[in-house]
Amino acid sequence: MNLFTDFEARINRILESIEIIREKRSELDFGRINVEPPRDASHGDVATNAAMVLAKPLGMNPRALADLIVDKLGQDPEVAGVSVAGPGFINVRLSVSYWQKLLAAITRAGVDYGRSTFGAGRKINVEYVSANPTGPMHVGHCRGAVVGDALANLLAFAGYDVTKEYYINDAGSQIEVLARSAFLRYRQALGEDIAEIPAGLYPGDYLVPVGEALADEYGTSLRIMPEDKWVPLVKERVIDAMMAMIREDLAALNVNHDVFFSERALHDNGAARIRTAINDLTFKGHVYKGTLPPPKGQLPEDWEDREQTLFRSTEVGDDIDRPLIKSDGSYTYFAADVAYFKDKFDRGFHEMIYVLGADHGGYVKRLEALARAISGGTAKLTVLLCQLVKLYRNGEPVKMSKRSGDFVTLRDVVDEVGRDPVRFMMLYRKSSEPLDFDFAKVTEQSKDNPVFYVQYAHARCRSVFRQAAEAFPDLDLSSVDFAAAAGAIVDPTEMQLVAKLAEYPRVVEAAALSHEPHRIAFYLYDLAAVFHGHWNKGKENPELRFVNDKNRELSIARLGLVHAVASVLKSGLSITGTSAPDEMR
């Protein structure tokens, strides 16, 4: 039950009952009417701008129209009071019986409260991480991994048919370098002194096991094999090894994908898929042969002062046209991007989200342009850019011992502080803003540590049920109908907690619509704060405690409230990919 959707329907019925609105309905923009929480909670529980939106096209004074609406709203038995503020905002205060009914609905729904049909089963593809398979994941990949995974969870909860996808960049020049780096480690495994790793190769010790595995499988045969024979073999083995390592890193962070799509598949059969995609663009008039003027500043790798096959991307929103086929006949990296998008589109995805690092900002316009060109404007592509993560310890820039190469790995961070703090804190900032991650802060047991504060609220909820089991040993809590007991909840501070729970469905839909999973993390912290505040009031006033062994009926009702809080906390934590512990010590 969505409080705001419910009252939107009630207000719409009232508007339909007003004669002048019925007469001019076709001239009115109902889409601009909002039903939302008031900015100031002291004004009420629900606010609407309906009178402000409709008054001008109706030729009425906003307050006069508001008075008409207020008169009819005041007749609703579940409305305790209605007032008009300012030039015509309408504020509604709900009755105790309405909050009780809502609490009953939340307890019945449990962890499914807030689940929405907003997405209407539409297919959506969320691509995230897509790190080059050239080594273990570093902390720079961590934020995009969490944001993408949590966003996919959120969209599924909001009713979309979600596919989580990883694009394996396994066809570029970096894979050639990786194969040669692994071959060097193979020679080392055979006893050869390789001295220093030559410049340009990958120096990380993570390739040592790959070299040893090659030595075990092939013995000395690779060393005497022609280069054009051993390179493809080593490429295959090292890509498999790197992807196994990356999958382990992702699993450590509780990040999951449904599809791992190999870029090499686009180049199979003479790059048939890339050819098909370019032919499709050509047929639609988006491809021509020409020479691009040199861009300002540093020249990009795909620029040539020769005739190339170009994508006329400036006609579909890009700043410059993009090369597809170089003068030597080879395909550009962007040509594979075109084929990959077409593959997704052909798989039935008309909504796609790419979660990329901030360093990919220059790719946004070209991706949006190819989406318009391939789909004819029918596909919706969204690019989310994740800003950098800076590591600190007690406010000082972190200087960690590095396990591999010269970077801090994702596993370094997860192994030190745990999966839950990493996941939750990666969501505790809007992804477009830089994030400071302090190893000391994320393990503090205080309200200043959001993940602890939220998880502790859930653990406290579960502890209330353990207290109840001791207070009422003859009561089977698993079979109690908490919804039926909700009528005993009457205290104003308890109503504040129900009101905060009532916001959850709206937060879910707004976060899904804006592709902002951080809104869930923010909401969970706010809910935890209201719950902890009520818990502390119970310490000061025994009458407000959740369990009162002298009042069984009231205790059962309050257990229903606690059950509702625990359910929403668990639901939201599940979206963020974070656990909801029953105990915390």
Swiss-Prot record:
GO annotation (BP), single: arginyl-tRNA aminoacylation
Q: Which GO terms describe its molecular function?
A: arginine-tRNA ligase activity; ATP binding
Quote the InterPro entries the UniProt record gives: aa-tRNA-synth_I_CS, Arg-tRNA-ligase, Arg-tRNA-synth_N, Arg-tRNA-synth_N_sf, ArgRS_core, DALR_anticod-bd, Rossmann-like_a/b/a_fold, tRNAsynth_Ia_anticodon-bd
Q: Catalysed reaction per UniProt?
A: tRNA(Arg) + L-arginine + ATP = L-arginyl-tRNA(Arg) + AMP + diphosphate
Keyword set, alphabetical order: Aminoacyl-tRNA synthetase, ATP-binding, Cytoplasm, Ligase, Nucleotide-binding, Protein biosynthesis
The UniProt entry, under SUPFAM superfamilies, shows:
Anticodon-binding domain of a subclass of class I aminoacyl-tRNA synthetases, Arginyl-tRNA synthetase (ArgRS), N-terminal 'additional' domain, Nucleotidylyl transferase
Q: What class of enzyme is it?
A: ligase
EC number(s)? 6.1.1.19
Cellular component GO terms held in the UniProt record: cytoplasm
List localization entries: Cytoplasm
Keyword Cytoplasm found:
yes
Q: Where is this motif: 'HIGH' region?
A: 131-141
Record-annotated disulphide pairs = none
Report quaternary structure and partners.
Monomer.
Q: Which family does it belong to?
A: Belongs to the class-I aminoacyl-tRNA synthetase family.
User: Could you tell me what this protein is called?
Assistant: Arginine--tRNA ligase
Natural source organism: Rhizobium meliloti (strain 1021) (Ensifer meliloti)
